[in-house]
A protein has these predicted regions:
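N-terminal amphipathic/basic-hydrophobic helices that include classical n-h-c signal peptides
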Residues: 1-14
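Short hydrophobic/aromatic beta-strand element in the GNAT-like acyltransferase core
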Residues: 62-66, 77, 117, 122, ...
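Conserved acetyl-CoA-binding loop of GNAT-fold acetyltransferases
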Residues: 193-201
């Protein structure tokens, strides 16, 4: 589950929000998809995400929520997908996390398989509105929406929001690190736990971005001319660069969290 937003505060301490789904207001789709975000460019180059993300709002609009402030500006949105976790040959949350749950969800939709679980996909907050608890409010609205559609569990392949500050820390260690009060060290994991979730497992290969060295140079502004691990701003783990093969690969780990409703 991706969480994105900057740190600039351009609003007062209290934000009055109106939250709706795209089923209720389909005319808002382009504005929702066009809302500002702070995703690192390379993150948007995941081929699975590129093939499926925009389809959520087109084919599953009841699972896309957005928030408007008192001026009618869209300040946040949340995407989720229903899927059949307990279908044959599944049953366990996938190691390929975010990518695979998107594939499962649209495969189920295409084949008419009845879903039994909702997976969070993203919560995005406009950089100007960050710092007012919107991520927690959108997560709560996503939980309520899943419950209203008859589901008893939301799962989330969570992208820890501060992991990029420690790209060499093993994800297993990071995911289970807690503060003295027992809450997770990571801010985004902490929001989920406060909402009622529990850490379930690591998704070691939740998202994969591969590209030529020229592409990685364009995406990051870094030289990508030396074999080995390259630290990229915003990346949770180093990117593996192999100049002799002319390519580099980023395999992002996430943390599976489970919300009982």
């Amino acid at each position: 589950m991706r969480f994105h937003g900057g740190r600039t505060r351009a609003y007062g301490d209290r934000m009055e929000l109106r939250i709706a789904s795209l089923t209720e207001r389909p005319e808002m789709r382009e504005r929702v998809l066009g809302m500002a975000n702070s995703w690192p460019e390379f993150v948007t180059e995941d081929l699975v995400g590129n093939a499926h993300y925009a389809r959520i709002s087109a084919e599953l609009p009841e699972y896309v929520l957005f928030a408007e402030d008192e001026r009618g500006e869209i300040v946040a949105h949340a995407h989720s997908v229903p899927f059949a976790l307990h279908a044959e040959d599944r049953g366990e949350l996938p190691a390929r996390g975010w990518d695979e749950v998107l594939v499962w969800a649209f495969s189920d939709l295409r084949r008419g398989v009845r879903p039994d679980t909702v997976s969070a996909i993203s919560v995005v907050v406009d950089p100007r509105a960050q710092g007012h608890g919107l991520s927690a409010r959108m997560l709560s609205a996503m939980r309520d929406n899943a419950r209203a559609h008859g589901f008893s569990e939301v799962v989330a392949p969570v992208r820890p929001s501060a992991k990029h500050l420690e790209p060499h820390t093993p994800i297993e260690e990071y995911a289970h690190r807690v503060r003295p009060d027992g809450l997770p060290h990571d801010p985004w994991l902490r929001v989920h736990v406060r909402a009622g979730a529990a850490v379930h497992a690591v998704a070691p290969a939740s998202m994969t971005v591969s590209g030529s060295l020229a592409q990685w140079r364009r995406w990051t502004g870094l030289p990508f001319d030396t074999r080995g691990d390259v630290e990229v701003p915003g990346a949770l783990v180093p990117v593996r660069c192999e100049p002799e093969r002319g390519c580099a690969v980023y395999v992002e780990p996430n943390v599976w969290m489970r919300h009982a409703l």
